[in-house]
Swiss-Prot record:
Gene3D superfamilies: Arginyl tRNA synthetase N-terminal domain, HUPs, Isoleucyl-tRNA Synthetase, Domain 1. Monomer. The keyword Cytoplasm applies. This is Arginine--tRNA ligase. GO terms for molecular function: arginine-tRNA ligase activity; ATP binding. Belongs to the class-I aminoacyl-tRNA synthetase family. Its EC number is 6.1.1.19. It holds the Pfam family tRNA-synt_1d. It catalyses: tRNA(Arg) + L-arginine + ATP = L-arginyl-tRNA(Arg) + AMP + diphosphate.
Amino acid sequence: MESRRMLKKIISNILKEALKEYLKDTDVKDIESYIEIGYAVDDKFGDYACPVAMRLAKVLKKNPLEIANSITEKIDKKYFDKIEVAKPGFINLTLSYNYINECINDLINNDDYGKNTVEDKKKILVEYVSANPTGPLHIGHGRWAAIGSALSNILKYAGHEVYQEFYVNDAGEQITKLNESVKAVQEGREIPEDGYHGEYIKDVAKQDGVPKDIILESQKKLLERFGTHMDNYASELKIREGGELEKTMDFLDKEGLLFEEDNAVWFKSTKYGDDKDRVVKKSNGTYTYFAPDITYHKNKIDRGYHYLIDILGADHHGYVPRITAAVRAVSKDTASLKVILGQLVRLYRGNELVRMSKRTGDMISLEDVIDEIGVDPTRYFLLMRSYSSSLDFDLELAKKKDNDNPVYYVQYAYARICNIFFKLEEKNMSYDDNKPLDISKIANESSLKLAKMILRFPDEIYEAAKSLEVYTLINYTYEIASALHRFYYDNIVLEENAEIRQERLTLIKAVKKILGLCFDIIGISKVERMWSEE
């Protein structure tokens, strides 16, 4: 665990040992449940804070300040310069310069820094986007594409085995409507009222090939351009026509999970927590859309994935209990499913809501947005909020080339570091790339804040993988950028004093590495030169 440099976990273990000693003559059990390590609310209180004394006060019937002082006496001091107690009973801990040096030098020299932070490694299949091949991907699909790929990268970095998949809804009535719409254009007729009316239908009609295949290929190319790389595109049509669907229904029947009523076949989903049983085969003998969905999820499990993540739009909220029941049934409760319901995206130009796309006749397409503002701003903005919150996306802000634009702000931090090293070379100033950091030689408020900020990286990865949230890593990149810009304004990095210059350059070299790792994970470019360089 030490090599992973998860400081919250390391500090938690230190507190645990101190608590064992302090509580050895009491009846208190499950010591770890009382320990929570957080960041101090203000730098003047230290780096980390623990409220364990207040949690124990009720159990021990003692004053929390008295408990905190007693625990503090038993804490191993080797990682800390200062351990203090603050009202009403917080234990505040400040990292030592020696330990900061040790961690940052490890960060610089270790390619696996912050990797493999999870102990319970899983084989995970993440299914996302899964759009109908009937039209361009809209901006909502773009949000799921950004979240799905960034989350997959986080899970991989944390140590899980991850497979990314797009389920192609290439069967059913919508495909018939697509074919009829394209044929109508080709024959110079009016598109049926319930058909697809976007301008893109004319483009599809001009091409040779099957309409759904043409559209799917364009979706694949756009996702690749967007930095979303699927491992597989699974076909609903193959599930329906390849015999797999019938085999799954036979499996459920043998398990006693199907019954007939009103000439239809029903799945006993209430047995697994759904509010009502669901039809899988209609009275006319055709399967409902739910039947291939059950089959597809069984297919995932049969391939060895027992932890499934589905990223869906919020309009699928009623679907969650039934598909969760299906996964429990087909896996015999050996697999688990997490459904992430992403909320909608509202596009603005300043204060004006952008409502329609002329090209698609529907929601604004992802390609329209990328063409206008670029991949990096699109990805970053779509990742800025929790998936459970709706997102207001200002296209004008995303195009700005100043610090009001958050993606510019964070990329400029990376470019600023690169520019400093370019200037170092231009000025032919000395720097020893192999010399370890000694933070004590440059210890001021901004350098210490920056150093301690980048040391949070392993914890940020671990917590993002645990919560399945990406926006926390976006916030973290912004905090690093803010600390870097503050450091830059407070300190002359290319200082004439070679000793000070050495330490400041080593510190920002470490910052560059962490920002680069964050950018790779969230899927934005590591830009080395920008238009506003000093």
